[in-house]
Amino acid sequence: MSLSIDVTSLPSISSSIFKNESSSTTSTLSGKSIGRNELYVSPDAEAFNKYMLSKSPEDIGPSDSASNDPLTSFSIRSHAVKTNADAGVSMDSSTQSRPSSNVGCDQVDFSFNKAVKVNANLDSSISISTDQKREKSKKDHKNGKHYPKIEAESDSDDYVLDDSDSDDGKCKNCKYKRKYFALRMRMKHVAMQLIEDL
């Protein structure tokens, strides 16, 4: 028996995740683990103006506000600075004192994932082929009920009756007795018909 499996045209699996998730990778060049804390400022115009005036225009990014209306709701990261070309973010409040590109500085890399789509396409087919041998069918017949094979010229006392038509023969309780007598009667008629035709 041979079995071959080949899967065909299964529907493609696609899933979309629309979330704004940020994952931070911490680099420990100086042996210290760096984390970034969030500082939430009260939503009033005075605090917002003070914060915006303390930063240069190129340092202000989307992370400075949590909504489209900064006066209503906005969040401030305590050490927010612009990202350098080497994808490192300096943890210092001043970028001029210690640039993030120097070796030995603590750096944190942020990666933002939005609208992630996962597509998995599986093209295959299923085919099953079986080869059944005769040996198996023979075994199935052996498992069934078996009857003894009777030869035409058998001398066994279990199956052959004597020549007399009496019920007191050797095979008085034989289950083939009726069939045997019916067959013998037909054979006699055939023999008599052949003699008459000759």
Swiss-Prot record:
Residues 153-166 have a biased composition (Acidic residues). Mg(2+) binds at residue 92. Its main location: host cell. GO terms for cellular component: host cell cytoplasm. It is found in: Host cytoplasm. GO terms for molecular function: ATP hydrolysis activity; magnesium ion binding; nucleotide binding; RNA binding. O-glycosylated. Hyperphosphorylated on serine residues, when in dimeric form. Phosphorylation by host CK1 is required for the hyperphosphorylation of NSP5 dimer. Residues 64-73 have a biased composition (Polar residues). Its cofactor is Mg(2+). GO terms for biological process: viral genome replication. Pfam families: Rota_NS26. Belongs to the rotavirus NSP5 family. Plays an essential role in the viral genome replication. Participates, together with NSP2, in the formation of viral factories (viroplasms), which are large inclusions in the host cytoplasm where replication intermediates are assembled and viral RNA replication takes place. Orchestrates the recruitment of viroplasmic proteins such as capsid proteins to these factories. Participates in the selective exclusion of host proteins from stress granules (SG) and P bodies (PB). Also participates in the sequestration of these remodeled organelles in viral factories. This is Non-structural protein 5. The lineage of its organism: Viruses, Riboviria, Orthornavirae, Duplornaviricota, Resentoviricetes.
